[in-house]
Design a protein with these regions (language model features):
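Short, functionally important structural connectors and interaction interfaces within domains
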Residues: 4-6, 49, 107, 144, ...
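The N-terminal extracellular segments of secreted preproproteins, especially immediately downstream
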Residues: 5-6, 341, 415, 520
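A sequence-level/structural motif corresponding to short, flexible coil/turn segments enriched
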Residues: 16-494
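C-terminal outer-membrane/trafficking sorting elements
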Residues: 496-507, 511-570
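Generic alpha-helix initiation/capping and coil-helix boundary signal
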Residues: 2-3, 9, 240, 317, ...
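Bacterial Sec-dependent N-terminal signal peptides
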Residues: 1-21
Length: 570
């Protein structure tokens, strides 16, 4: 038995991080001044293996044999083939920033972001479309406060585009003492994802934004109830769009209870993930907030006492068949009201886990034993997608320097096998100037983190299957270079096995009391140092409540062969 255990252990290897092999690398140089860099280049990989890249540019350039022309600080969308060949490029001509990108199974690409003034959406067939942004007193504002979403087909033909142009809340205008400045009312789409024939999006917003009969209404404050100072408060929503990219339904929204507050409490961030007929929403908020999902409203009274504010991280599971919520769970952390950095920036589903990524200060809401170093830290939390219980969580633990002047900024994350690849950087708070690039590999099966030391700043990341797309920037001789690469990822299993063939599934995972097996089998449970801690023959279930918490290897044998599985005992 001991020999069997050690032989099994020898075939099981813990990977510190996957192996990444570059397939190709391309770059664009000197099309944007160093002063205009925004440290964000959202990228995507299609199911066909093509890579889409985005960014800002102020100088015209040639791509795929055609000139991409700039007006002011425009945005570009580029398509590279599986071999890195330049397929096509289009410009969003005017003042625009692409914030998020995704693809569908047919290779269509969707982009969303913000714009100002007049924006022309390019198209490879020459049929462009123009959208106008927010105006104040009849004059376009310079702030990129209007939102947009656009769809392009595999050949770069513009198929649909929608703008989201906010206006003042009628309640605020009625006060007679509301004097908004540019950007006080706005619509910011921060994430889009395509699933089962629909495009989903999340947005934060202030003021009133209307589209296709649906209204997104921010909150407002009457400070201390004195009737002398009014202003806008941020609300958030997760919604879906039809083929014309019009709003077709709002799945979840959160805003200040009653639409009005006497303090500055608001929604801090909103994100979501969608998979297998379920949507997982995530809001971070403070003060008195109401979450609405379908016809159900749930109020949250987040504490604000003695200068300490509670920041609720509110997660829900929504059944897309009927729009109802089966579960909502709140995780919280508290800190003084100055300088909040508690945000859920990204959510992904991988197998049975829900992955959350973002930043936090003080204590991490998903693990109160984790404290931020200096100003704030990046984090990844791994949750059971069915119960929203936390499996494990990790933080960057980087000391960025003076808490009054430096911080860490989250750049994005994606999933490769059992690993999350997270990017970010340290920056100067006042200017957002980058100081140190940060990249991490996180093994979701056990919560271990490996920090890399990249030479360049990673500004975008996405994966599809074993293909990993990375955008980077570097500055040399006062010239900015955007670098795009497609890479092949291997050895992406946290604990890999050479044995295959039994075809037995193990559940639940994580487990508390009893492990179940879909087929009767011989079972050997091995800890991570190779010692057999439990075994049984021809069983469909096995009690494990006596095992200590941690990760185990389950060796499963049937007449069809032997395989292994990873299980977390809680």
């Amino acid at each position: 038995v001991l020999l069997l255990a050690f032989c099994a252990a020898a075939m099981l290897t813990v990977q510190a991080q996957p192996t990444v092999t570059n397939s190709w690398t391309k770059s664009q140089t000197d099309i944007l001044s160093v002063a205009n860099v925004n440290n964000s280049n959202p990228v995507a990989v299609s199911a066909q293996g093509d890579m889409y890249a985005t960014g800002l540019f102020t100088e015209s350039f040639t791509f795929g044999g055609k000139e991409i022309e700039a007006v002011a600080t425009s945005s570009y969308l580029l398509k590279y083939g599986t071999d890195g060949a330049e397929k096509w490029g289009v410009a969003l001509t005017g003042a625009a920033t692409i914030k998020t990108i995704t693809t569908d199974g047919a290779g269509n690409v969707y982009i969303a972001g913000n714009f100002a003034d007049e924006l022309t959406f390019g198209s490879t067939d020459g049929n462009t479309q123009v959208k106008e942004g927010i105006k104040m007193d009849g004059t376009p504002i310079a702030d990129q406060a209007a939102g947009f979403v656009a769809k392009y087909d595999v050949n770069g033909v513009l198929k649909a585009v929608q703008s989201f142009v906010s206006k003042p809340l009628p309640e605020l205008e009625a006060t007679g003492i509301y004097f908004p400045e540019a950007g006080d009312y706005r619509f910011d789409i921060n994430n889009i994802a395509y699933s089962d024939g629909k495009l989903y999006a999340s947005a934060s917003y202030k003021g009133l934004t209307e589209n296709n009969g649906f209204s997104f209404k921010g909150g407002y404050f009457d400070l201390d109830g004195g009737g002398f100072w009014y202003g806008d408060l941020v609300s958030g929503a997760v919604f879906y769009l039809n083929d014309q990219l019009e709003v077709d339904g709002i799945l979840a929204n959160m805003g200040v209870t009653g639409g009005k507050s006497t303090d500055l409490s608001s929604v801090q961030s909103v994100s979501f993930a969608v998979a297998e007929g379920k949507l997982y929403s995530g809001f971070v908020a403070s003060g008195k907030q109401t979450l609405t999902i379908g016809s159900k409203e749930q109020a949250f009274d987040l504490s604000q006492e003695n200068g300490v504010t509670e920041y609720g991280h509110i997660l829900s599971i929504i059944d897309l068949a009927d729009g109802s919520s089966s579960l909502t769970k709140k995780y919280s952390t508290t800190h003084d009201a100055y300088g909040n950095y508690c945000f859920i920036k990204s959510m992904l589903v991988k197998g049975d886990v829900l992955l959350l990524g973002g930043t936090f200060n003080a204590k991490l809401a998903f693990d109160q034993n984790i404290d931020a170093v200096s100003t704030n830290d990046l984090y990844v939390a791994v949750l059971n997608k069915n119960t929203l219980d936390v499996n494990n969580a990790v933080a960057s633990k980087v000391n960025e320097g003076d808490a009054n002047s430096k911080k860490e900024e989250f750049g994005g994350m994606t999933v490769c096998g059992d690993y999350v690849y997270m990017i970010g950087h340290t920056a100067v708070i006042a200017s957002h100037a980058v100081e140190t690039p940060l990249t991490f590999w996180i093994d979701t099966t056990n919560g271990t983190m490996t920090q890399a030391n990249p030479a360049n700043l990673a500004t975008g990341v996405a994966a599809s299957g074993t293909k990993l797309a990375i955008a980077q920037t570097q500055v040399a001789d006062q010239k900015l270079e955007n670098i795009f690469s497609l890479n092949e990822v291997s050895n992406a299993t946290g604990i890999s096995s050479t044995e295959q063939g039994a075809g037995v599934s193990v559940y639940p995972n994580p487990v508390v009391d009893v492990l179940n097996f879909t087929t009767p089998c011989d079972v050997v449970i091995i800890n991570l140092i190779g010692v057999t801690v439990k075994q049984a023959e021809n069983v469909s279930s096995l009690p494990v409540s006596d095992l200590i918490s941690g990760q185990y290897i389950i060796k499963l044998t049937t007449e069809d062969g032997t395989s292994t599985a990873k299980v977390i005992k809680k």
